[in-house]
Amino acid sequence: MTKRITKVCIPTAGSGKRLKYLTKEINKSLIDINYKPAISYIIEKFPSNSEFIIPLGHKGEIVKNFLKIAYPKKKFIFVKVKNFDGIGSGLGLSLLKAKKFLKTPFIFVSCDTLFEGSIPNLKKNWVGYSSTKNNGQYRGIEFNNRNEIIKFHKKSFKSSKFKKTYI
């Protein structure tokens, strides 16, 4: 029997430049949405036995302190990402820094992704995505005509009928 995936990676290292003044003093994962930080909506979607890998960068100590205080019974592994802005920074670097904790199947969720419904009982590779007309500000997925993923795109990719925005 295949075990359910319980490891969750939520990178929070980025500086959130597109949010401008909102992220000057706080990490984008902690921006309040209806009186609750965005990252809380994500963490609360997962079962109590989940292990969270959190790459930290911009205002990382604030994120770390918040999570330890708000969720004292949750298991967190914090990974420091020093180069979180500028040349060589980005999501790929955050995942590389967390690599030693991600040697088993895991669920990746961007720190500012909000979604309805529950997390499926995942036992194998899976990607959640959404269609959007204004997809230039998001990363994207390109599918072939058999609905198989053939490429992940950086932000500002050109849209086509086989491309979707992933979460």
Describe the residue ranges of each PLM region.
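Glycine-rich phosphate-binding "P-loop"
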Residues: 21-24, 28-31
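Short glycine-/acidic-enriched loop or helix-start segments at secondary-structure transitions
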Residues: 20-21, 63-66, 117-120, 138
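Short beta-strand/turn micro-motifs composed of small residues
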Residues: 12, 56, 110, 130
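Conserved N-terminal catalytic core of the sugar/cofactor nucleotidyltransferase
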Residues: 2-10, 18, 32, 36-106
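Conserved core of the sugar-phosphate nucleotidyltransferase
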Residues: 114-167
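Short, polar loop motifs at secondary-structure junctions
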Residues: 58-60, 112-115
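Short beta-strand-to-loop acidic/aromatic patch adjacent to the donor-nucleotide binding site
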Residues: 104-114
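N-terminal beta1-alpha1 ligand-phosphate binding loop
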Residues: 12-17, 25
